[in-house]
């Protein structure tokens, strides 16, 4: 099965959706079959690859509520090797519809195996929150990539995200790893960007990608044309940054990729989507998160080592 990477940060405006779109497109540009899964009700990923959520036959919403299998929601894009499962405004109410379901945090992980076999990578754009949709994404993922803007208060709230990852590991997905921390919106003209980069590297160490995504006009313009940066202007700094990130991820995952290719049908990683041995308690990880929320707020700048990353 292809590797599932969730792009997550509950803070808005950190480059999460930009990273999801352009990482997926860059992986596709290296001829690795990639599925971009938009689980954010804002559907910016969907429009960012040239799709109108109102015009698609099915979206991730229908998948989550059990109306269609995931394979029927897949839409091809203009870019070879890149497909998408679009989002829809109806997804806003999905968490309410899912709340009474048994093992509600595992709905996405149960739906994905049939499509994971067709791809080398699945990139999930999570909502800017730590609600049920994000929990489903983390439960379904092999790893999580955390974008962090190179601006003041960059580390604010990360303790809560790391605590969520820790709880998901304990209750739902023990194999969840940190793919890496990505510095975004880096402005080479500002000393502040360098200071933030040093601070992030001090807290996260080797988990910080060597690649840094710089502020770039073309990167900001591309979504309004419904294109990833690599299709909008491949020579732009933003497109080059995300190609460098894709290469870094491919290098870090070489063993996984070779295993995936060797087994042909994608049986590598099968255990990541296996059925749990026992049903989760009724409150599940959601209850554990509520209990630990105040604790996480106090630890918002806790070093990554405390979370065994």
Language model segments and positions:
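P-loop NTP-binding core
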Residues: 1-309
């Amino acid at each position: 099965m292809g590797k599932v990477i969730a792009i997550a940060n509950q803070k808005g405006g950190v480059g999460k959706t930009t990273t999801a779109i352009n990482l997926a497109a860059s992986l596709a540009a290296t001829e690795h079959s990639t599925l971009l899964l938009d689980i954010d009700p804002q559907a910016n990923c969907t429009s960012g690859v040239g799709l109108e959520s109102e015009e698609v036959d099915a979206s991730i919403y229908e998948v989550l509520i059990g109306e269609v299998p995931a394979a029927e929601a897949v839409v091809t894009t203009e870019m070879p090797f890149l497909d998408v499962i679009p989002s829809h405004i109806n997804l806003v109410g999905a968490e309410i519809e899912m709340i009474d379901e048994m093992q509600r945090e595992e709905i996405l992980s149960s739906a994905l195996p049939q499509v994971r076999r067709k791809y080398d990578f699945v990139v999930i754009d999570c909502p800017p929150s730590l609600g049920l949709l994000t929990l489903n994404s983390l439960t379904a993922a092999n790893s999580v990539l955390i974008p962090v803007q190179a601006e003041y208060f960059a580390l604010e709230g990360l303790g809560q995200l790391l605590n969520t990852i820790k709880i998901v590991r304990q209750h739902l997905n023990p194999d969840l790893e940190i793919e890496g921390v990505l510095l975004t919106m880096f402005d080479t003209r500002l000393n502040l960007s360098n200071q933030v980069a040093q601070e992030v590297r001090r807290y996260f160490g080797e988990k910080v990608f060597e690649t840094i995504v710089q502020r770039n006009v073309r990167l900001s313009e591309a979504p309004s044309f419904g294109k990833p940066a690599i299709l909008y202007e491949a020579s732009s700094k933003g497109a080059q940054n995300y190609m460098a990130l894709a290469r870094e991820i491919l290098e870090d995952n070489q063993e996984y990729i070779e295993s995936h290719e060797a087994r042909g049908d994608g049986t590598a990683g099968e255990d990541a989507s296996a059925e749990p041995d026992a049903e989760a308690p009724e409150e599940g990880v959601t209850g554990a998160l509520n209990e630990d929320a105040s604790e996480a707020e106090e630890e918002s700048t806790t070093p990554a080592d405390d979370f065994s990353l």
